[in-house]
A protein has these predicted regions:
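Pre-Walker A (Motif I) flank of P-loop NTPase domains
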Residues: 97-102, 128, 181, 312-314
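Conserved SF1/SF2 helicase motif Ia
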Residues: 106, 113-144, 150-154, 309-313
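Charged, low-complexity intrinsically disordered regions
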Residues: 1-61, 127, 151, 175, ...
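Conserved helix-turn-beta segment of the N-terminal RecA-like "Helicase ATP-binding" lobe
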Residues: 137-163, 170, 174-177, 337-341
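Generic structural signal for small/hydrophobic residues in well-ordered secondary structure
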Residues: 55, 87-90, 94, 102, ...
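Conserved pre-motif I regulatory segment
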Residues: 61-103
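Inter-lobe coupling linker of SF2 helicases/translocases
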Residues: 168-215, 220-222, 226-229, 233-264, ...
Length: 494
């Protein structure tokens, strides 16, 4: 809940500003109403039993399957390489359990798991053509590791030249006509393979319908005009995308992704695709982003296609950091890998997921410029966590460093050494300038294209490293971080 006051600008124009005191009081009342509702819900035994039964039947009905890969044989694998038990179990999950998230820590052997699963899928007839998508710097390493694990594997590796405009059509034709055990390419190359315009249009129209429903719902409840305006703006942007899609004539007439015969996708470092746009009626809540990356939307469309043709199998994501910044990242991973399962539970959009498994909290936080504190609302508290984790673990194979007891060198002294560095007069002066700029941004006194909080945060990080990253003529602080690092490295070297 946010209370805004209308401020007239003259000439019939006006804008809204947040009333901090009234907002605090309204949110306190909101929390009281939530507590009263909980008390009312459980006060009547019959009513309580009704909703407890509904919740258990809908969400608390999962017994997690345990996968044992000890019996697996790997024809064609290098006999000098022996996979560890947790790797065999993960491969068994991929083969038997459908879409999988390999949420394993660094050094757990995710690459070998995907490679072995890829070859076994092909051998068992579970997949005919697999594409392995990896970060650009790892293409060569992935290819050599694949051939080390399976020396006779028939793999196609995309080079940088293969996706140049003059050669792209030829390379994509090789994918369509060749019988490969695995096709290895980079994240950016994978994005250049187009998905059909019809599929894009269906997705955009579904999002527009969802927003239109939410707008009608907000209006019927006399919801905030501010929120309705934001949703109308978002709806208009999506409609413009559909129009652009209809008018678009592809510069190079490539075969679409659906026509390549690919029926399995394996994505290494899958956290690179977590920035998926999420539509929500909640506004001004940190941790929820309505703007997403184009490559994430492209990945979502391709994953939807693979799930459709394979019955919710054929997708493998691998990352050591599936959830690192916000709770929404868990929803995004579920959207990629288990959307039908969510829909079976009546969860068709983010707000429904958030209502069941999350909560918005408001607390005092340090301002961006570090000059004081402000109340900030964040979507950062899980509710019904045991049930959510059971749903998540249906696709997620989680292995932490503690679970695997990996041989990691211990820190000298058992903990990190804190080295303090004092700011000089120049750093303090720039920090004061950040305060002035932040206040101007909050009051709408500067165009966002000229200055914004993201710019201040970026400059503050640079300043925290060394002032000369912002201004090459800034004074050299002898007590600065870089000088401290250089001094410590020299002492260690001595």
């Amino acid at each position: 809940v946010t209370v805004r006051d209308r401020v007239d600008d003259g000439d019939g124009k006006y804008h809204y500003v947040v009333n901090k005191n009234e907002t605090m009081l309204a949110r306190e009342k909101q929390n009281q109403m939530k507590e009263k509702f909980k008390e009312w819900l459980f006060a009547d035994p019959e009513r309580r039993a009704k909703y407890v039964d509904y919740y258990n039947e809908t969400f608390n009905n999962i017994r997690l399957r345990e996968y044992d890969g000890s019996h697996l044989q790997f024809p064609g694998m290098n006999p000098e390489i022996e996979l560890k038990p947790h790797q065999k179990n993960a491969i068994a999950r991929i083969l038997l359990g459908g879409n999988t998230l390999l949420a394993h820590c660094v050094g757990a052997g995710k690459s070998f798991e995907m490679m072995a699963a890829c070859m076994e899928q092909k051998r068992l007839g579970l997949a005919n053509k697999t594409v392995m998508v990896v970060p650009k710097p790892l293409i060569g390493q992935t290819a050599s590791e694949f051939l080390r694990l399976y020396p006779s594997a028939n793999i196609l590796v995309a080079t940088e030249r293969d996706f140049e405009k003059s050669r792209r059509k030829q390379f994509i034709s090789r994918i369509a006509t060749g019988d490969y055990d695995c096709i290895i390419m980079s994240h950016s190359q994978f994005e250049k393979i187009p998905i059909s315009a019809e599929r894009k249009e269906r997705m955009l129209q579904a999002q527009i319908d969802e927003i239109a429903y939410a707008i009608d719902d907000m209006k019927s409840q006399n919801g905030e005009q501010w929120t309705v305006k934001q949703m109308e703006s978002q709806k208009k942007k999506l409609q413009e995308q559909i129009s652009a899609l209809a008018d678009e004539s592809r510069k190079d007439d490539l075969i679409t992704f659906e026509e390549l015969g690919i029926d399995s996708i394996m994505v290494d470092e899958a956290h690179a695709f977590k920035n998926l746009a999420i539509f929500s009626k909640m506004n001004n809540v940190s941790g929820i982003s309505s703007s997403g990356a184009k490559k994430a939307t492209d990945m979502q469309l391709k994953c939807q296609y693979i799930s459709e043709i394979n019955g919710n199998r054929g997708i493998v994501f691998a990352t050591g950091t599936p959830i690192s910044n916000t709770m929404c990242e868990m929803y995004v991973m579920q959207l990629y890998l288990q959307k039908p399962a969510l829909e079976q539970m009546g969860i068709y959009h983010f707000d429904s997921w958030a209502a069941n498994f999350g909560e918005v909290t408001t607390a005092l936080e340090l301002t961006v410029e570090g000059s004081g504190f402000r109340f900030k609302s964040r979507f950062n508290k899980f509710t019904n966590l045991p049930e959510l984790m059971n749903i998540y673990r249906e696709v997620a194979d989680v292995q932490t460093a503690d679970m695997l007891d990996l041989d990691v060198p211990a820190l000298r002294g058992g903990k990190a050494i804190i080295v303090e560095s004092e700011p000089d007069w120049y750093v303090k002066q720039v920090m004061e300038d950040f305060v002035v700029r932040a206040e101007r941004i909050r009051n709408g006194g500067v165009d966002p294209s000229v200055d914004n909080f993201l710019k201040i945060t970026h400059e503050a990080r640079l300043l925290g490293t060394d002032a000369r990253l912002i201004d090459k003529d800034a004074p050299n602080n002898p007590d600065g971080k870089l000088n401290k690092v250089a001094e410590n490295v020299w002492n260690e070297y001595q």
